[in-house]
Amino acid sequence: DIAIRGDRIVGIGTNLGTADRTIDATGLAVSPGFVNMLSWATDSLIADGRSQSDIRQGVTLEVMGEGWSMGPLSDEMKAEAPGQQGDIKYDVTWTTLGEYLQFLEDKGISTNVASFIGATTVRIHELGYADRAPSTEELERMQELVRAAMEEGALGVGSSLIYAPAFYADTNELIALSRVAAEYGGRYISHIRSEGGQFVEAVDELITIAREAGIGAEIYHLKAAGADNFDKLE
């Protein structure tokens, strides 16, 4: 038997006493809610906060921010937003990542939500889609965007280095952003730069970022693509 008070498990075992409500789970499995570590429910939760496709599979936490996050947004990014939307259309009424998360909470959603700040989002905010390194001043502004997001509750910095314009960022840029997240106990999480011929080098880059920034790091969907690269996972 499992005893629950409010939103906490307070007892597991037999003879736990009586309760105001009893659920007969005979023949069923009882587990904590599942975490969707790479969620793209950013738009669908706006359309339908019930999150039926995930909540009915036991998902209770949507973690967003694989390289791209719903904030911070510049005026130019807001202007581009309608043309980048798919079947789900909506007005962008927020600017920062924290404001987006608050928007979802105020709207009402079934799942819990959390987000990394996207390294791509920060880069576009300051550099647009330019294939170049940021200037000292631009990098400082990018770091301040990360700082603001961390203070709003971001989990850390997320990157997706296999896509443009994300792969325009070099290792030093990612270290600089991650150092700010590290100050708040955040993490660096990445869709690494290569899952094929440069797989080992891509993993080495993530380790370098973690060491230089003093931050914990994780890899999204760790895999090696192509039979010639399978042994690299060893």
Outline where the language-model segments fall.
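Histidine-rich, glycine-flanked metal-binding segment
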Residues: D1-G33, D48
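Generic beta-strand/beta-sheet core signal
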Residues: R5, I12, M64-G65, F116, ...
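Residue-level detector of flexible, active-site-proximal loop/helix-junction positions
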Residues: L16, A29, T120, A224-G226
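A structural micro-motif
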Residues: D20, L28, T111, G186, ...
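Histidine/acidic residue-rich metal-binding segments in metalloenzymes
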Residues: A133-S159, P165-E234
